[in-house]
């Protein structure tokens, strides 16, 4: 009996994604159009929305917990996402994946796989824009389109927004408040997208780590290479890899 090769597996995933994308393109087009119309009007009529300032921005859990949250910002690296999911399963670990809408549009099967494995989905904007430079209405549209596309594909309600590059301003906070969403940043950054070095990723994700921290990662080969050792380190030090929402709830 012949075993399926990685190349054949990639072809199968690509074919599956293509079929799903064809089935959803029309629905997405209507969604984007309708949200664009809605976002031309202020939220709640003429009433101002209280963004709550920095009180609605989280870089870690409010108090120390026994959990560490790995947050993967995803605009590329589909094959590494599958590797990461398998490694997380091996350690009974959970994570939060902040999805770029344009990536999710091309990788519907992968998005559904993330959710089916018990992980949390978050919003990373649709087109990876600088949210500090957008108006409130532009922020609303960029965030809402991503939210509603993910909901259309998976049924998941998205409550967390991680701005690309951590860039946000008052308008972004007001948009998140209007959408009843929390803005999520990080307490430590592996900078895996730049250095592409598994040993550096490991050190940055483990050195002096405390419960309640949010660790920023991306679906890079070096990150996947280091992930198993990172999770083992957490286990040895009585830390659990949990979703951002679980960490916030336990540390509240």
Label the model's feature ranges.
Residues 1-71, 86-96, 210-252:
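Terminal accessory/targeting
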Residues 46-134, 138, 142-145, 149, ...:
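Active-site beta->alpha N-cap acidic-glycine motif
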Residues 82, 86, 109-112, 141-144, ...:
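Solvent-exposed, polar/charged alpha-helical surfaces in well-ordered, non-transmembrane soluble domains
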Residues 173-208, 239-251:
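His/Asp/Glu-enriched short active-site or ligand-binding loop at hydrolase and phosphoryl-transfer sites
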Residues 78-79, 104-105, 133, 170, ...:
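Loop/helix-junction capping segments adjacent to catalytic residues or to phosphate/diphosphate-binding pockets
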Residues 152-168, 173-176, 222:
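Basic- and aromatic-lined ligand-binding clefts that recognize polyanionic substrates
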């Amino acid at each position: 009996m012949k075993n399926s090769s990685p190349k054949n597996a990639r072809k199968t995933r690509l074919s599956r994604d293509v079929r799903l994308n064809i089935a959803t393109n029309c629905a997405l087009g209507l969604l984007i159009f309708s949200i664009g119309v809605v976002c031309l009007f202020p939220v709640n009529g003429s009433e101002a929305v209280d963004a709550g300032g920095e009180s609605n921005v989280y870089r870690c859990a409010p108090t120390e917990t026994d959990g560490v949250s790995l947050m993967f910002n995803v605009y590329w690296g589909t094959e590494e996402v599958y590797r990461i999911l398998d490694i997380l399963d091996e350690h009974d670990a959970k994570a939060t994946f902040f999805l770029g809408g344009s990536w999710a549009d091309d990788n519907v099967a992968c998005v559904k796989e993330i959710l089916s494995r018990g992980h949390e989905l978050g919003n990373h904007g649709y087109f990876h824009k600088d949210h500090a430079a957008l108006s409130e209405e532009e922020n609303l549209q960029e965030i809402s389109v991503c939210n509603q596309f993910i909901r259309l594909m998976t049924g998941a309600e998205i409550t967390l927004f991680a701005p690309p590059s951590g860039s946000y301003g008052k308008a972004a906070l007001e948009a998140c408040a209007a959408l009843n969403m929390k803005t999520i940043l990080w307490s430590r950054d592996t900078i895996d997208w730049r250095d592409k070095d598994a040993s550096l990723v490991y050190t940055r994700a483990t050195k002096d780590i405390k419960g309640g921290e949010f660790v920023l990662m991306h679906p890079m080969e070096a990150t996947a290479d280091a992930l198993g050792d990172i999770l083992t380190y957490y286990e040895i030090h009585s830390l659990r890899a949990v979703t951002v929402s679980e960490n916030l709830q336990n540390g509240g």
